[in-house]
């Protein structure tokens, strides 16, 4: 290991061992209680300064602003009352709810052969997570999925928790200005004014939404993925054969949840995948997804042709018993679809897809994921693992977008969705990829048509291929669009996409970009209450409440840093201008003065006041600049002054 890699691992180890509560600036962790004391839904409440509404300089009159509550994925990592210890893990929020249902049993030990081998290997003791929980599984003849309960008409505590969470406390806002919202265009989505537990149950029962909630991951705070709810964002983490350690991945997990990751996928392909995943699960307040194929491939030394159902089955059980909430399974890639990719510019770009394609060609038969799909569903139903049906034939370039191979696989995913629903297994559908803007809506339309409104989960899509290093932007454009059209969850893309494994800063950049895309999609759909935060920030901006502007933003730290680059003094935080326009040309300052002028003069209408004000201030500034230009000799360019 290089010295830089050793240092990175040491730094990460130090960080996770000394994790302390790091709340956002001017924010408090608040909990909204449900119908029972153990339903306590976390929110981040942003406190705001008072607004100056009148009076004099000596005796100003202020009006209070209500604090704004926003969706919070950070778990106890931003709760000052909780003593964080990654070696102990997070509180088991859902354990009592799971026990009350009385449809699970505790196992004496792990069932997976591979898990048994890892536990017996004493050389792994230093890496192993020390506080392993007792494993649960459905009792014989029982199904323990949220879809099963929903279809039985049962509103679970998870469903009530989600209803409270999705409403984000907006019912308490009486301010007309904050509640103002433009009507959106939802493209057929059903967006109620208020999310109720019954609405959550119904959406899950119909297959339009999922609650990823493995019974062996009770630490996860319940959340929902569906187009009639807030658009969610997934963050990918995971080691590779050449980079990253357990400590770094746990650090990235905590970092991801802090910056808004609604779910996290562990895509580890390097050493000690089993141990890394255990550490992640025990410390994750959000659902964790995986691609089991990656670990199965490691078990056969990276030779795709040597994969088989027995190895895959053992891997699924291993991960389900650890607590993985959803599996990406590339079961829709059929043998006859592989030749359809022959004329593509970039062929098959999905790792899982390429593995399956190679196996199908080597054995000249359908993959074991397809032929054993019903057995996969039986395993998932015992632990409530949701299936994320992978798009192994997604386009890897805009040239390959919406081709025959992509849509052939999509139709098969729709067929498999119906099979999974026979077992009450929750399903989401994965989508592209690289798609130019004018071809994005067709993807959403085809998915809704062929996959029976199961939630769509896309990687971007990237709208152009010319910007390596900026693919968080090329994909953020497509993500906002497809989110508006009905996509339920967006998988983030970092600046390192196509270039390397992302570090902490890349993870943050990717998440902020995608939280922005998701929010833009919610606004465009007309999701109830989505505009409250925008309205609060706009009001703060107009009133020059700089600290409130920073704190209401998706990234308060960066917003404050950019402002302070040019106005670092504390006086800059109360100034009625920024460094872009200065005090004389600030449009908002002029607008405020216009309003005051019109209010003070009963004879002058607002439109007349604007004309008068435009003469009073900006034109005087223009005249001053004109005189300066003439005094300098009226020359456009002047010779550089050489230093003496």
UniProtKB/Swiss-Prot annotation:
Assembly and binders: Homodimer.
Annotated binding of [4Fe-4S] cluster, by residue: 578, 581, 586
Record InterPro entries: ThiC, ThiC-associated_dom, ThiC/Bza_core_dom, ThiC/BzaA/B
Cofactor: binding comment: Binds 1 [4Fe-4S] cluster per subunit. The cluster is coordinated with 3 cysteines and an exchangeable S-adenosyl-L-methionine.
Species, as recorded: Aliivibrio fischeri (strain MJ11)
GO molecular function (one): carbon-carbon lyase activity
Name of the protein: Phosphomethylpyrimidine synthase
Cofactor(s) required, per the database record: [4Fe-4S] cluster
Originating gene: thiC
């Amino acid at each position: 290991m290089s010295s830089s890699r050793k240092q990175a691992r040491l730094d990460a180890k130090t960080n996770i061992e000394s994790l302390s509560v790091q709340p956002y600036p001017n924010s408090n962790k608040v909990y909204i209680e449900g119908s029972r004391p153990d339903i306590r839904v976390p929110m981040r409440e942003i406190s705001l300064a008072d607004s100056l509404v009148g009076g004099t300089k000596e005796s100003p009159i202020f009006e209070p602003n209500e604090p704004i509550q926003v969706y919070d994925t950070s778990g106890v990592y931003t709760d000052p009352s909780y003593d964080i210890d990654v070696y102990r893990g997070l509180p088991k929020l859902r354990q009592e709810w799971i026990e009350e249902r009385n449809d699970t049993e505790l196992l004496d030990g792990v069932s997976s052969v591979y898990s048994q081998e890892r536990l017996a290997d004493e050389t792994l003791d230093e890496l192993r997570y020390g506080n392993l929980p007792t494993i649960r599984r459905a009792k014989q003849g029982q199904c323990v999925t949220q879809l099963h309960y929903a279809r039985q008409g049962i509103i679970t505590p998870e469903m009530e928790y989600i209803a409270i969470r999705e409403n984000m406390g907006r019912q308490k806002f009486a301010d007309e200005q904050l509640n103002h919202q433009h009507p959106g265009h939802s493209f057929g989505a059903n967006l109620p004014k208020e999310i109720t537990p019954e609405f959550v149950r119904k959406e899950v029962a119909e297959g339009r939404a999922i609650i990823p909630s493995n019974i062996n991951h009770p630490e996860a705070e319940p959340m929902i993925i569906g187009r009639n709810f807030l658009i969610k964002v997934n963050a990918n983490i995971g080691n590779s054969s050449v980079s990253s350690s357990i400590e770094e991945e746990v650090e990235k997990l905590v970092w991801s949840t802090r910056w808004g990751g609604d779910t996290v996928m562990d895509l580890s392909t390097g050493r000690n995948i089993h141990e890394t995943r255990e550490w992640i699960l025990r410390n994750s307040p959000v659902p964790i997804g995986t691609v089991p194929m990656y670990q199965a491939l490691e078990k056969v030394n990276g030779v795709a042709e040597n994969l088989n159902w027995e190895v895959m089955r053992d891997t699924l059980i291993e991960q389900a018993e650890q607590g993985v909430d959803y599996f990406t399974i590339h079961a829709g890639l059929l043998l006859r679809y592989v030749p359809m990719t022959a004329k593509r510019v970039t062929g098959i770009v999905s790792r899982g897809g390429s593995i399956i394609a190679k196996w199908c060609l080597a054995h000249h038969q359908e993959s074991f994921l397809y032929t054993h799909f019903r057995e996969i569903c039986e395993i998932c139903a015992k632990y409530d693992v949701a299936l994320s049906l992978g798009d192994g034939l997604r386009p890897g370039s805009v040239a390959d977008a919406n081709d025959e191979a992509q849509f052939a696989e999509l139709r098969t995913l729709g067929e498999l969705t119906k099979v999974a629903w026979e077992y009450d297994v929750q399903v989401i559908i994965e989508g592209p990829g690289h798609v130019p803007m004018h071809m994005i809506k067709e993807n959403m339309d085809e998915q809704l048509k062929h996959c029976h409104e199961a939630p769509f989960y896309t990687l971007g899509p990237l709208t152009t291929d010319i910007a390596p290093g900026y693919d968080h932007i090329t994909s953020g454009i497509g993500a906002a669009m497809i989110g508006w059209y009905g996509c339920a969850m967006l998988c983030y893309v970092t600046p390192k996409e196509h270039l390397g494994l992302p570090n902490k800063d890349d993870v943050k950049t990717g998440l902020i970009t995608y939280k922005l895309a998701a929010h833009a999609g919610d606004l465009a759909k007309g999701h109830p209450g989505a505009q409250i935060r925008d309205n609060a920030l706009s009001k703060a901006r107009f009133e020059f409440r700089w600290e409130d502007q920073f704190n209401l933003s998706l990234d308060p730290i960066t917003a404050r840093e950019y402002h302070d680059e040019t106005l670092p003094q504390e006086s800059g935080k109360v100034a009625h201008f920024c460094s872009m326009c200065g005090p004389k040309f600030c449009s908002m300052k002029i607008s405020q003065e216009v309003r005051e002028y019109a209010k003070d003069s009963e004879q002058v209408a607002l439109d007349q006041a604007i004309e008068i004000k435009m003469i009073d201030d900006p034109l005087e500034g223009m005249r001053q600049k004109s005189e300066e230009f003439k005094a300098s000799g009226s020359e456009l360019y002047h010779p550089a002054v050489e230093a003496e």
